[in-house]
Amino acid sequence: MAKAVTIKVKLVSSADTGFYYVAKKNSRTMTDKLVKKKYDPVARKHVEFREAKIK
């Protein structure tokens, strides 16, 4: 079987609330770390979410 192109990554909140999203990423075209600005319901505001590995 062929290796999957898309991988799942965990987007962890930079506000250190412990909240995270799970996103898909194309590992061939996006080689750098994924950073998105999304809503953190624990902090109740929009913050940066940075990529981390899913354990």
UniProtKB/Swiss-Prot annotation:
Protein name per its UniProtKB record: Large ribosomal subunit protein bL33
Organism of origin: Bradyrhizobium diazoefficiens (strain JCM 10833 / BCRC 13528 / IAM 13628 / NBRC 14792 / USDA 110)
Keyword set, alphabetical order: Ribonucleoprotein, Ribosomal protein
Gene: rpmG
GO cellular component: cytosolic large ribosomal subunit
MF terms in GO: structural constituent of ribosome
Residue ranges of the TM segments: none
Annotated signal peptide: none
Classification via NCBIfam families: PRK00595.1, rpmG_bact
One Pfam family from the record: Ribosomal_L33
Family: Belongs to the bacterial ribosomal protein bL33 family.
GO biological process: translation
